[in-house]
Amino acid sequence: MKCPYCGYPDSKVIDSRPTDDNTSIRRRRECLKCGKRFTTYEKVEQLPILVIKKDNRREVYDRDKILKGMIKACEKRPVPIKVLEEITDEIDKRIINSMEREITSTEIGEMVMEKLKNVDEVAYVRFASVYRQFKDINTFMDELKKLLKENETKKEKT
C-alpha cells in the first residue's frame, strides 16, 4: 500500500480487524520508509447487477422497486411493512448471493410471487395480475383456480 505521507510504495500491516458492522476490514499500516502510520479499509467490491426487462432493455437492479411493488399489492391488506421489508431482504440476498451480473425481471417477479403467496393470497393475486399482465377475466380466473387447487392440496395433506 502506497504511503500517503511520503509516497513510498510499501508498508507493513500492524493491526487488522473487522469493522463493527462486519462489512469491511480496518488495517493499521506503517510505512517502511518514513515510519508514519496510516489506516486503510478493505471492502468487497459490489458490482452493479443488471435487470433484463421483458423488452430486453437493461436497467440497474434496485431493491426498492421490489418493496414498492409489494406495498402496492398489499394496499389495504393486513400485512405489516416489516414483513414486506423482510421479504425484500431475503430476495435481495438471494439475488446478490447468486453472483450473477444479470437477472431477468421474470425471475425477480417469480421470487416475489412465491413469497407473497405465503403471506397474503389477495396481495399475491394483485401482484400476479400486474406482473403477468392478465389480458382478461379468464386469465385472472385461471390464476385463482390454480391458487384454490393448491390450497385444497395443502388441506388434504394436513
From Swiss-Prot:
Q: What is this protein called?
A: Transcriptional repressor NrdR
Q: Which residues form the ATP-cone domain?
A: 49-139
Question: What's this protein's function?
Answer: Negatively regulates transcription of bacterial ribonucleotide reductase nrd genes and operons by binding to NrdR-boxes.
Species annotation: Thermoanaerobacter pseudethanolicus (strain ATCC 33223 / 39E) (Clostridium thermohydrosulfuricum)
The entry assigns this protein to a family as follows: Belongs to the NrdR family.
Query: Record's superkingdom?
Result: Bacteria
| The UniProt record lists the keyword GTP-binding | no
Which PANTHER family would you find in this protein's record? Answer: TRANSCRIPTIONAL REPRESSOR NRDR
Q: Please give the cofactor(s) recorded in the UniProt entry for this protein.
A: Zn(2+)
Pfam families in UniProt: ATP-cone (PF03477), Zn_ribbon_NrdR (PF22811)
Q: Which residue numbers delimit the unnamed Zn fingers?
A: 3-34
How does the cofactor attach, per the note?
Binds 1 zinc ion.
Q: Which GO terms describe its molecular function?
A: ATP binding; DNA binding; zinc ion binding
PROSITE patterns reported in the protein's UniProt record: ATP_CONE (PS51161)
InterPro entries, per database record: ATP-cone_dom (IPR005144), NrdR-like_N (IPR055173), RNR_NrdR-like (IPR003796)
Query: What UniProt keywords apply to this chain's record, in alphabetical order?
Result: ATP-binding, DNA-binding, Metal-binding, Nucleotide-binding, Repressor, Transcription, Transcription regulation, Zinc, Zinc-finger
Which Gene Ontology BP terms does the record give? negative regulation of DNA-templated transcription
